[in-house]
């Protein structure tokens, strides 16, 4: 994306009277030379890939090295049987992040969002948010555009 600063993206939004996420989507479509609808569908596909990656988690499978794999299941058990200090929502995010990390280490579908080093933090947060707060998919897609724009600028 060609935005060099948050201010630049914000100014486009103000100039065209559109929200921040839409400015990012328009820039994405322009940069990739696709229709706005195609940009939306691509982000929707990425969201579904994140959901699929989390669904693919198997708590009894370990990585080839044997070092990781069960942590997401352990966190789920803790959440169900204890009262996590960080509360239900944050512990759900932690569980999702551990599952994504285990799947990445086990060479399942790799979701490197925002980067491979963060190992699926965006999916972990957004999936927990969708489940916990019962928001619609369009809201998540808009949030993904927002996050991708911020990530690109930073």
Model-identified regions with their sequence ranges:
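Generic N-terminal targeting/processing segments that precede catalytic cores or assembly contacts
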Residues: 1-108
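A structural-propensity feature for long, helix-poor, extended segments
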Residues: 145-154
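Alpha-helical support elements that line or immediately flank enzyme active sites
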Residues: 123-135
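Short, surface-exposed, charged/polar-biased interaction segments
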Residues: 71-75, 118, 128-131
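Conserved phosphate/anionic-ligand binding catalytic regions in large, soluble enzymes, centered on
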Residues: 107-125
């Amino acid at each position: 994306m060609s935005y060099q600063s948050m201010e630049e993206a914000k100014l486009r939004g103000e100039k065209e009277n559109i929200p921040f996420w839409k400015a990012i989507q328009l820039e994405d479509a322009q940069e990739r030379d696709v229709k706005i609808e195609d940009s939306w569908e691509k982000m929707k596909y990425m969201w579904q890939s994140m959901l699929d990656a989390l669904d693919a988690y198997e708590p009894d499978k370990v990585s080839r090295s044997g070092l990781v794999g069960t942590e997401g299941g352990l966190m789920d058990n803790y959440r169900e049987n204890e009262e996590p200090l960080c509360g239900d929502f944050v512990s759900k995010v932690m569980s999702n992040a551990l599952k994504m990390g285990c799947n990445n280490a086990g060479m399942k579908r790799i979701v490197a969002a925002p980067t491979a080093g963060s190992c699926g933090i965006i999916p972990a947060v957004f999936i927990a948010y969708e489940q916990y707060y019962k928001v619609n998919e369009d809201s998540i897609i808009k949030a993904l555009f927002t996050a991708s724009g911020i990530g690109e600028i930073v």
